[in-house]
């Protein structure tokens, strides 16, 4: 029997040295700062993975990760330890700003140019509630203002499991609690067991793609009119946040916006002008 376990504890215990090594792996590959205070959470979330893979302890698992040449194992790791708590119309002030400020400006710009496409990136999209909310807002805006333009919403995440959930677009009732009833009826189909599925009219507006925000460059040939990266950078240290903000800046069009989580800040970036809490504009 593994000495790191007892009959009352189904989790595999992680030592201080093992925890330190695992924290380093997560930071180097994903930019996420795991705290040593997360020890119990890590044990509870990873123990089942270790058992399925046949590892007797965390040292064996970490040795395997360090020697691994592929990224499938790393994706499995981040899938297990990531917290994916989100819902439709989360931090609604951003969507008010989108409807009242950003979309009118984009409409004016489109009407005065040959380019009729709006490009929006939901970075760290988790299970899809954010990009689908954006799609709803755009559909409603175009219908209300009797305008029509091409819309491309790119939604990316490092986690394969949440991307699969996002593509399926099925959510329990607590995820749509902030959704007005008329939007619920218009854009969701009610399923059994109090679950709801996003209709195809929204699904076809959103393209989901796996992407690591720590990649040196992003595989995009065109810039964006708006980037959402909300409640993602809270896991990063200041250096990583600043590096990511600089990368976002390089993929934004002039006079476009970056929206981050309301508990997050970007400091010392001369290219991004602070507009209001969690809202920045590229000069």
Curated annotation (Swiss-Prot):
InterPro entries: Bact_Chemotaxis_MeTrfase (IPR050903), Chemotaxis_MeTrfase_CheR (IPR026024), CheR_C (IPR022642), CheR_MeTrfase (IPR000780), CheR_N (IPR022641), CheR_N_sf (IPR036804), SAM-dependent_MTases_sf (IPR029063). It catalyses: L-glutamyl-[protein] + S-adenosyl-L-methionine = [protein]-L-glutamate 5-O-methyl ester + S-adenosyl-L-homocysteine. Keywords: Chemotaxis, Methyltransferase, S-adenosyl-L-methionine, Transferase. One of its GO terms (biological process) is methylation. One of its GO terms (molecular function) is protein-glutamate O-methyltransferase activity. It holds the Pfam family CheR. Methylation of the membrane-bound methyl-accepting chemotaxis proteins (MCP) to form gamma-glutamyl methyl ester residues in MCP. This is Chemotaxis protein methyltransferase. It comes from Borreliella burgdorferi (strain ATCC 35210 / DSM 4680 / CIP 102532 / B31).
């Amino acid at each position: 029997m593994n000495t790191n376990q007892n009959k009352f504890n189904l989790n595999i215990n992680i030592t201080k040295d093992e925890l330190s090594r695992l924290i380093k792996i997560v930071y180097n590959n994903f930019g996420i700062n795991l705290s040593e205070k997360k020890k119990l959470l890590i044990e509870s979330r990873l123990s089942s993975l270790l058992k399925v893979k046949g590892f007797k302890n965390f040292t064996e698992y970490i040795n395997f990760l360090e020697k691994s040449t592929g990224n499938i194992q790393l994706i499995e790791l981040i899938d297990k330890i990531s917290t994916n708590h989100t819902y439709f119309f989360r931090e609604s002030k951003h969507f008010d700003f989108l409807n009242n400020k950003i979309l009118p400006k984009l409409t004016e710009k489109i009407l005065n140019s040959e380019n009729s496409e709006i490009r929006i990136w939901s970075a760290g999209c988790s299970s899809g509630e954010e990009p689908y909310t954006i799609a709803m807002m755009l559909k409603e805006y175009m219908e209300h203002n009797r305008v029509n333009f091409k819309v491309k919403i790119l939604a990316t995440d490092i986690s394969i499991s949440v991307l699969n959930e996002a593509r399926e677009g099925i959510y329990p009732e607590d995820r749509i609690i902030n959704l007005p009833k008329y939007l619920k009826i218009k854009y969701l189909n009610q399923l059994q067991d109090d679950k709801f599925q996003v209709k195809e009219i929204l699904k076809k507006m959103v393209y989901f793609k796996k992407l690591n925000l720590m990649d040196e460059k992003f595989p995009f040939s065109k810039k964006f009119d708006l980037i959402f990266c909300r409640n993602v950078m809270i896991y990063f240290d200041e250096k990583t946040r600043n590096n990511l903000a600089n990368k976002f800046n390089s993929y934004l069009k002039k006079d476009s916006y970056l929206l981050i989580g309301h508990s997050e800040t970007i400091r010392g970036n001369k290219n991004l002008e602070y507009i209001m809490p969690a809202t920045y504009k590229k000069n």
